[in-house]
């Protein structure tokens, strides 16, 4: 057990503790017919994806990182009666499962072991899974293989539903409805699990409220150190969400400056960390085709009745970020090296979505040969993990990890 306090104080400082989520039932329920609705482009060979994900966790453990797993944490959390009641009160509501099925479903779930309940909440629940006759209108409408609770395959990407920013955490209101239950379940872990209960400071936002157009996802959030936070605004994170998060951070003195980076709204660039990540010191890897077109909004605490002071900075993003971090310039390693075809291919395969374990040491998919070679040429150690199956989810090692303890640099 680590003795360090919860908090993420940089992008590349020594990683002490991280949460990941293994592939499982939710991914076995992905089909060519439903994968788009569930925000996947393809289906996994789940057996291989599980083995590759185990290798991901084992590699971090070998490097001294304490690796926690979402399903296990949730199962342990649900053994706590107060936590189980809180989760089921909000997950098994008439709005979600209909008036006719709610009581039977709740009575059954109240008696399940925590681990099994966690499996259904993450993996999804069909009419055929329940031990009672689902004779309600909702049950009849769904049919035997219809989802009472849809699966949450994107929980694999633990980065997104919460963001640790310096000494606190945001519980993120996610863009797509298919992902929003992830935030509720993660909030339960933070509020009730013995490893987190009483030690977590929630900065923003309440997972039980409707936040309207204010959306935020962790792949867009980078606490880079010294009170500076970079945030992407693209497909998943809105200006409204960035403004509210910045206001909350400034109000508590947890950040002094937020640079919001405007991105194109595209699947290939859904988050900031799909086009730009830090590797150590001033070295970054980036898909320059997108990054070179991004512009920045510089946010500081406002004065008087003005909640935020905002300036639109039209300089290139790399110049803005370098200056804000105190560097003369950033050493930008292009995704895919110098070949434009490989640049496009390797960006699609998360070539620049790397996770720093400490300054100069990152994890990335083995399939991105040119990106990894270019990083090594700049002195970065790349620990490769198998990406043939996991890469089908369109998320790399940074996407698949939620750091909860990371040192400053």
Curated annotation (Swiss-Prot):
GO cellular component, one term: cytoplasm
GO MF annotations in UniProt: arginine deiminase activity
Record's subcellular location: Cytoplasm
EC class (word): hydrolase
Alphabetical list of InterPro entries matching this protein: Arg_deiminase (IPR003876)
EC number(s) per entry: 3.5.3.6
GO biological process: arginine catabolic process to ornithine; arginine deiminase pathway
Keyword Cytoplasm set for record: yes
Predominant place of localization: cytoplasm
Reactions catalysed according to its record: L-arginine + H2O = L-citrulline + NH4(+)
Keywords: Arginine metabolism, Cytoplasm, Hydrolase
Pathway: Amino-acid degradation; L-arginine degradation via ADI pathway; carbamoyl phosphate from L-arginine: step 1/2
Catalytic residue list: 399
Pfam (any one): ADI
Alphabetical list of HAMAP family matching this protein: Arg_deiminase
Family per similarity comment: Belongs to the arginine deiminase family.
Name of the protein this chain belongs to: Arginine deiminase
Organism: Dinoroseobacter shibae (strain DSM 16493 / NCIMB 14021 / DFL 12)
